[in-house]
């Protein structure tokens, strides 16, 4: 599921291991270190204190809090704790959200309904010192001395004169004609005196009003091919301008409402939207932006969460959020500091006005070379505040968007004033979107359960359920799930055990994620009972908007704009997920990223020049290429089709076909000595072409195992001798392909594969013993190109275990949807195979992790099946003749014994299967992590472009 792996520390915080592929030698080294890893005594792993980092396995992936260690690790990420709480002031912005939504739906243990407060666990601080000459100092001063940095309010540790000296507002924030050339007044918030440029404290519009310059927004777009920085700047500084709750569709308001932001967008690099991580809440997403980690990996799985090991609850208003033990991973400001790059503050107390934040960043940019940071951040609580209060479509939203744009204009005017507007890189980014939600659209669990007082529900736009009392022996998650599943025709939530959630959410492998999870329909809330929802005395709701829904929902998408000398000029890029931004920010600063969930290099197309060039991972296991090695009599399948073959001498010919090392019709005919060289394929499925079924190269196996390449006329497979089934099966279907029927005599039997040892083959006997299990085929017999080729589809090496209920899904996909996609896209290549993820960590399971087998056999039962469907992006080109960019859609389908996830599964498959598949859409990278395979290894496209393809998620949503 991600690019790196983690191990839990003794306090439960998990930190990532190095990302990237392992070479064989690195893998051996990793395996040798495993024993040492298990003996280490981990310490606290917090952002800024000692952490444990794991070395990568073949594809790498970050482990989450509470997960079992799987890979060795080494010590790293040590820094002073003085920067740790930078992130905690996110609470400032989130308290606003809390005021309109979270505290209006009570949890079982109750919400704090008091006014926002500043909480601190810091020791008592003497505030008798002074902030004179110290306002917004970059070095945090520890107790017992008082502080003057931007976080002192959060810790109640400011010097007594902080407000007087550092939060000045006299004179306002802008110059007027009357103020130009004024006598310096130190009580003013900013200055318009003749010496203000030299002293670095001018109001941002000083040169516009007093010197006749133009506003930045009024200048034409200019292509900045190289940074134009003053002397002393080692690298272009990076300013991250983050906005809370900025729905991507707000950008449609354009230059009439947001002229400065629109200029950044049109002159720089932008995407139609950026996808947040799930849950689409503020704390998880802001920390994901800072670390590149999924919430299950960095540990901040929600704005509110309970840790069963700590026996403590993390709240936006509680003191626990200040405890380092909750925060995992390595945020950008620590990565910078560890590599000798100074970082300014990232987050601000709400009492500091936006104008003061901008002026402070600009003043930091004028510091001497040895004290000037290279990375800064600005955070705005808007438009989230107004979005919750008025809803995303309320006319009241225009003013807060104008205010944000005004602040952006102040920043850009200030940079131009300092002659840094061609030097600095600016990222304008949101954390999540906003949806139209009111308390009138609330589902109450009391309408489904009789014992809601026995549970604790984290309510709202998603639901997380745990027992109210930890020692409740009667608490039965499966029974609760059953009582919440498909009980009403108009039900607006869907219950899941967390391991059954769509894999694309990456929201299971953390002890802070409750076992029961409710995915709530957009525009709806969930609560325990009506008394848990507060309303105004008039009966109206306190809020009109909220967020937290499925991260593929279009209303949850947010904004990304990159502007500056390192970003491309006037460039639109495809949407991407926010886990990828950490690597980009590191590239902009010349840093080596800490291990993270992003795919480094997948966003290279955003930048004018790239300091990081990704390389393809090395193959760990090469395949065997077996010929005919066994006799028919060696096999006892219990359901042999050989006696159904007519005429009898045709059996030898069918087996000889399997000896062909290649997949072209010409090679097959040459081997068989066929006289029908020009025989037309009546189904149109076959188009002679070498490697026709591996259009993008053979998938590489990135772990040690044994597997064989098995060629057939209509498909090719990588057959595992360990798992007794293909790791992958690939086939190409043309637009003209026809779906054919299956002869009755082939519906209940399979053929032995004389290339594979009977000891490495499945048997129908096992399925006869297991009444709950059946089998299916990875290549669909329905799409066979000829009667002879259909026999290949019934080889035992094409067989995989499947629950009867799941076969309904799989057969409909193969029989109907593959043909549909091939027709729509001018042919497709399909790669399908099994997934084993019993510990639901998003990583490929080794054999010791597998918990279920076909009864009385060594045939493992997959937890999921995957399918990757690729075509030419230009549908006028056939899939097997594409010379341009590719288009991909992928699925990770849960392999379960029932279809209760779809409430209408009793109906015809056409009514529900495709919708179920869309729910379980996935990235190719997700599949690679779950299989330890590497796809698309031989294409005409650059490797960074292939990484972009692999990280693409087809959301099946309407336009933003």
Residue ranges and their predicted role:
Residues 288, 292-391, 489:
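His/Asp/Glu-rich, glycine-adjacent segments
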Residues 127-214:
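Secreted, short cysteine-rich peptides and small extracellular cysteine-rich domains stabilized by multiple disulfide
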Residues 457-571, 576-584:
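Active-site neighborhoods of enzymes that stabilize oxyanions during catalysis
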Residues 90-125, 129, 169-170:
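N-terminal signal peptide
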Residues 219-269:
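Active-site-proximal N-terminal segment of extracellular/periplasmic enzymes that hydrolyze or transfer
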Residues 440, 621, 626-632, 639-960:
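Domain-level detector for secreted/extracellular nuclease and nuclease-toxin modules, and
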Residues 231, 354-369, 376, 383-424, ...:
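A long, amphipathic alpha-helix that forms part
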């Amino acid at each position: 599921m991600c690019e790196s792996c983690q191990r839990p520390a003794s306090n439960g915080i998990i930190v990532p291991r190095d990302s990237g592929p392992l070479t064989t030698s690195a893998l051996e080294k990793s395996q040798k270190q495993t024993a040492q890893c298990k003996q280490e005594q981990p310490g606290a792993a917090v952002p800024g204190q000692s952490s444990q980092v794991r070395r990568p396995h073949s594809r790498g992936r970050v482990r989450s809090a509470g997960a079992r260690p799987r890979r060795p690790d080494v010590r790293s990420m040590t820094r002073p704790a003085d920067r740790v709480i930078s992130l905690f002031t996110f609470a400032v912005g989130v308290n606003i959200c809390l005021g309109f939504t979270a505290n209006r739906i009570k949890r079982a243990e109750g919400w704090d309904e008091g006014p926002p407060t500043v909480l601190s666990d810091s020791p008592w601080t003497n505030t008798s010192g002074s902030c004179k000459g110290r306002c917004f100092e970059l070095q945090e001063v520890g107790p017992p001395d008082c502080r003057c940095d931007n976080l002192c309010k959060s810790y109640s540790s400011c010097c007594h004169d902080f407000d007087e000296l550092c939060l000045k507002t006299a004179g306002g924030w802008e110059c007027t004609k009357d103020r130009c050339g004024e006598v310096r007044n130190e009580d003013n918030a900013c200055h318009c005196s003749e010496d203000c440029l030299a002293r670095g404290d001018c109001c941002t519009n000083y040169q516009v009003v007093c010197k006749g310059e133009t506003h930045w927004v009024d200048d034409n777009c200019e292509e900045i091919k190289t940074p134009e920085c003053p002397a002393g700047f080692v690298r272009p500084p990076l300013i991250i301008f983050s906005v809370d709750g900025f729905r991507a569709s707000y950008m449609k308001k354009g230059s009439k409402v947001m002229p400065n932001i629109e200029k950044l967008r049109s002159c720089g690099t932008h995407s139609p939207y950026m996808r947040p991580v799930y849950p689409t809440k503020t704390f998880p997403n802001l920390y994901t932006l800072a670390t590149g980690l999924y919430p299950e990996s960095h540990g901040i799985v929600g704005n509110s969460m309970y840790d069963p090991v700590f026996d403590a609850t993390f709240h936006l208003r509680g003191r626990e959020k200040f405890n380092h033990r909750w925060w995992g991973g390595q945020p950008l400001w620590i990565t910078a500091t560890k590599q000798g790059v100074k970082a300014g503050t990232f987050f601000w107390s709400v009492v500091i006005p936006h104008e003061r934040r901008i002026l402070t960043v600009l003043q930091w940019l004028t510091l001497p070379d040895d004290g000037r940071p290279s990375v800064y951040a600005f955070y705005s609580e808007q438009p989230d505040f107004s979005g919750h209060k008025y809803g995303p479509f309320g006319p009241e939203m225009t003013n807060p968007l104008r205010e944000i744009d005004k602040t952006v204009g102040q920043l850009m005017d200030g940079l131009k004033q300092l002659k840094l507007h061609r030097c600095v890189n600016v990222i304008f980014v949101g954390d999540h979107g906003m949806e139209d939600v009111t308390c009138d659209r609330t589902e109450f669990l009391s309408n489904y359960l009789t014992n809601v007082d026995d549970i604790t529900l984290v309510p709202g736009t998603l639901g997380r359920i745990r027992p109210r009392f930890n020692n409740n022996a009667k608490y039965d998650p499966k029974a609760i799930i059953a009582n919440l599943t498909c009980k009403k025709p108009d039900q607006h939530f869907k219950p899941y055990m967390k391991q059954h959630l769509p894999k694309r959410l990456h929201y299971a492998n953390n002890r802070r994620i409750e076992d029961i999870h409710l995915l709530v329909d957009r525009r709806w809330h969930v609560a325990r009972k009506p008394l848990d929802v507060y309303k105004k005395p008039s009966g109206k709701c306190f809020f009109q908007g909220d967020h937290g829904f499925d991260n593929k929902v279009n209303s949850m998408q947010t904004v990304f704009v990159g502007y500056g000398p390192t970003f491309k000029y006037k460039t639109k890029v495809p949407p991407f997920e926010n886990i990828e931004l950490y690597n980009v920010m590191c590239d902009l600063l010349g840093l080596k990223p800490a291990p993270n969930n992003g795919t480094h290099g997948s966003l290279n197309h955003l930048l004018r020049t790239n300091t990081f060039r990704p390389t393809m991972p090395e193959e760990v296991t090469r395949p065997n290429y077996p010929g005919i090695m066994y006799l028919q009599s060696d096999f006892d399948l219990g359901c042999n089709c050989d006696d159904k073959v007519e005429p009898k001498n045709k059996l030898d010919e069918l087996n000889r076909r399997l000896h062909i090392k290649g997949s072209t019709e010409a090679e097959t005919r040459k081997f068989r000595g066929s006289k029908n060289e020009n025989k037309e394929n009546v189904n149109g499925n076959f188009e002679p072409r070498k490697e026709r079924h591996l259009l993008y190269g053979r998938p590489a196996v990135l772990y040690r195992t044994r597997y064989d390449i098995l060629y057939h006329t209509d498909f090719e497979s990588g057959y595992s001798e360990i798992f007794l089934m293909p790791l992958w099966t690939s086939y190409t279907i043309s637009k003209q392909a026809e779906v054919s029927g299956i002869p009755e005599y082939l519906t209940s039997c399979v053929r032995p594969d004389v290339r594979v040892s009977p000891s490495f083959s499945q048997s129908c006997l096992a399925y006869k013993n297991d009444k709950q299990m059946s089998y299916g085929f990875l290549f669909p017999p329905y799409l066979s190109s000829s009667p002879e080729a259909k026999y290949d589809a019934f080889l035992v090496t094409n067989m995989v275990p499947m629950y009867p209920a799941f076969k309904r899904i799989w057969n409909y996909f193969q029989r109907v949807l593959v043909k549909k996609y091939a027709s729509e896209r001018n042919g497709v290549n399909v790669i399908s195979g099994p997934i084993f993820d019993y510990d639901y960590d998003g990583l490929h399971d080794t054999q010791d992790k597998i918990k279920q087998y076909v009864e009385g056999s060594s045939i493992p039962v997959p937890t999921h099946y995957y399918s990757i469907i690729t075509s030419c992006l230009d549908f006028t080109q056939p899939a097997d003749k594409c010379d341009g960019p590719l288009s991909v859609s992928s699925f990770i389908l849960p392999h379960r014994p029932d279809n209760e996830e779809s409430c209408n599964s009793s109906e015809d498959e056409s009514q529900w299967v495709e919708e179920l598949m869309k729910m379980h859409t996935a990235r190719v990278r997700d599949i690679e992590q779950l299989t330890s395979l590497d796809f698309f290894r031989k294409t005409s496209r650059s490797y960074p472009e292939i990484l972009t393809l692999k990280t693409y998620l087809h959301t099946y949503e309407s336009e933003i």
